[in-house]
């Protein structure tokens, strides 16, 4: 079983159009929507929602753009005086032990869920820059998913794998391997929360180890390594039609590759 998910619907019009195109003419079968951006186009999203075989979920975001709060809290630990988010994964990890920060975060996540529900019923939850994977934050997300009847929360266990391409052996890939180890270790704790709240999740993901290098090869070899014994594997990509963003444009082209679909189907029949 496999899910091929486009994160970041709503981050730009070019991303939105790439996601729509790849859902119609490619192998994309899922997306995650950022609702706190000026580019969250609900007309395009409705076309995706009209496809009964396409998953639409919520991409929780405290990394960039603005909070949905109408009244800003003075001296917020979550956003600046203009309501803008400027959080890195590292800064959020550090603040995730602060009760006041977690209370603010829960309120902002709740606002994003309720904004999504005005337009669609999310089938799953994940987050921008994997911030919901941080264990103290994951607990909040699972609690909210249960409260709002959202059945699936992404976890981030990725089996390290290698592909026959020397270009992939770079400093960036080594950094990504560290991310894989960190997120996979978090998943060991996070799956207990999944069980506690009776939620669903994936068994594996593909997309962290080769971030910025996702193409037909990395997708194929990633699924070959991670989708075994009927386990559910979710690939995450960030496609765009903006050719200046070469890595993301390459992901878009990969999603339109019919040969890749045939290869993935053969893997599932093993």
Stretch-by-stretch model annotation:
Residues 1-3, 9, 13-120, 124, ...:
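Terminal accessory/targeting
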Residues 127-129:
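Active-site histidine-anchored catalytic micro-motif
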Residues 132:
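Conserved strand-turn element in the central/C-terminal portion of the radical SAM core barrel
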């Amino acid at each position: 079983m496999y899910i091929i998910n486009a994160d970041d619907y709503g981050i730009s019009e070019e991303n939105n159009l790439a996601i729509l195109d790849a859902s119609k003419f490619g192998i994309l079968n899922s997306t995650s929507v950022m609702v706190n951006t000026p580019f969250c186009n609900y007309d395009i999203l409705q076309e995706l929602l009209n496809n009964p075989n396409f998953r639409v979920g919520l991409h929780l975001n405290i990394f960039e753009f603005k909070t949905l709060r109408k009244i800003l809290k003075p001296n917020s630990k979550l956003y600046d005086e203009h309501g803008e988010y400027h959080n890195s994964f590292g800064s959020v990890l550090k603040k995730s032990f602060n009760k006041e920060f977690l209370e603010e975060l829960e309120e902002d996540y709740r606002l994003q869920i309720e904004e999504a529900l005005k337009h669609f019923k999310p089938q799953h939850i994940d987050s921008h820059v994997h911030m919901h994977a941080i264990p103290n934050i994951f607990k909040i997300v699972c609690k909210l998913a249960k409260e709002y009847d959202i059945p699936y929360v992404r976890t981030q266990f990725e089996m390290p794998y290698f592909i026959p391409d020397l270009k992939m052996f770079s400093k960036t890939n080594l950094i990504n391997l560290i991310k894989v180890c960190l997120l996979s270790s978090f998943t060991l704790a996070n799956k207990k929360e999944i069980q506690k709240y009776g939620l669903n999740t994936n068994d594996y993901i593909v997309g962290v180890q080769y971030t910025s290098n996702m193409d037909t090869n990395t997708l194929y070899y990633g699924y070959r390594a991670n989708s075994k014994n009927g386990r559910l594997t979710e690939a995450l990509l960030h496609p765009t039609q903006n050719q200046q963003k070469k890595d993301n444009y390459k992901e878009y082209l990969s999603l339109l590759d019919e040969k890749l679909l045939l290869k993935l189907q053969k893997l599932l029949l093993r």
